[in-house]
């Protein structure tokens, strides 16, 4: 499967086209809108989320609530476009039009794609860069992830995410929770955290950053249960599932690190404490005593829960802007200010769930059958029986 997104932050709409989704998948706008609403929530979101009411329109690939196997097109309208129709219009603008009308930006923001993107594509107006590099694009990536989650759900794979850290405030490790329990707790937390004791402390950190014109980042974790053993491959570098998951996490705006299982902690421990001992019993087949590998070894699933974490840096748009240089005059200035969040870690966790879900669903479809859900389910059932008796 693959998808491609299109659209600008303040353009008329965002679009995603999904190719390779099997026929026979139950899919409605309601499924997708639930995920879009989750992305809009979270303590620390800015005024843009008060303007937009993200809802999806399915315009191809689905008939009467069932996928057809043909490309699926999803669109999400930008409600704020009505205030930007002249600024973001597709028609040419007369030389007489003022820079104010175009809302031209010549002062790049440190930490954003602004300067590098302007140099790469030759844009003298940085708005041409920031409109596409904006995290607003993740709206339709979450829509794509909602489709992937629906595939996973029908195949018995469940996924959940939660926030581990915000602005240096760390949640305690809470184990032995089911995916359903994680989902219930996080949906009732303003910061999507499992540790109620630090929830308010995280919110205070966000509020303090906002009041001082600053921003803060954090760490999110995604867990998926129910993946069969042996999904992915050790044969080629680009078929390793852990590599695909790490790449997916790193593709999210402002994410600067990814780890799987114990991750970087593995460098500090001896092998005897890192590697997961193999067990077998008649009921479960092969399993592991521990899950330090995060459900992945040699680029393939082990049958244990998939555990992926991502590190999000503080959002670069600051209301207390850093020093920059005007690309027209080369004079030192304070960077431009665009409407933004003070902390988007809780929302980014939803995006992380979406990209992980997509990679897992893609791997299953690729390995067990591309055309229709019925065949996919049969093949996975046969594989699970085979792996158990192996």
UniProtKB/Swiss-Prot annotation:
GO biological process, any: aromatic amino acid family biosynthetic process
Annotated binding of NADP(+), by residue: 39, 45
InterPro entries, sorted: Chorismate_synth (IPR000453), Chorismate_synth_AroC_sf (IPR035904), Chorismate_synthase_CS (IPR020541)
Cofactor binding remark: Reduced FMN (FMNH(2)).
This protein's UniProt keywords: Amino-acid biosynthesis, Aromatic amino acid biosynthesis, FAD, Flavoprotein, FMN, Lyase, NADP
E.C. numbers: 4.2.3.5
The protein's required cofactors: FMNH2
Residues annotated for FMN binding in this entry: 132-134, 253-254, 298, 313-317, 339
Any one GO MF annotation of this record: chorismate synthase activity
PROSITE patterns: CHORISMATE_SYNTHASE_1, CHORISMATE_SYNTHASE_2, CHORISMATE_SYNTHASE_3
UniProt superkingdom: Bacteria
Disulphide bridges, residue numbers: none
The protein's role, per its UniProt record: This reaction introduces a second double bond into the aromatic ring system.
Subunit structure: Homotetramer.
Family: Belongs to the chorismate synthase family.
Entry protein name: Chorismate synthase 2
Organism: Bacillus cereus (strain ATCC 14579 / DSM 31 / CCUG 7414 / JCM 2152 / NBRC 15305 / NCIMB 9373 / NCTC 2599 / NRRL B-3711)
Gene that produces this protein: aroC2
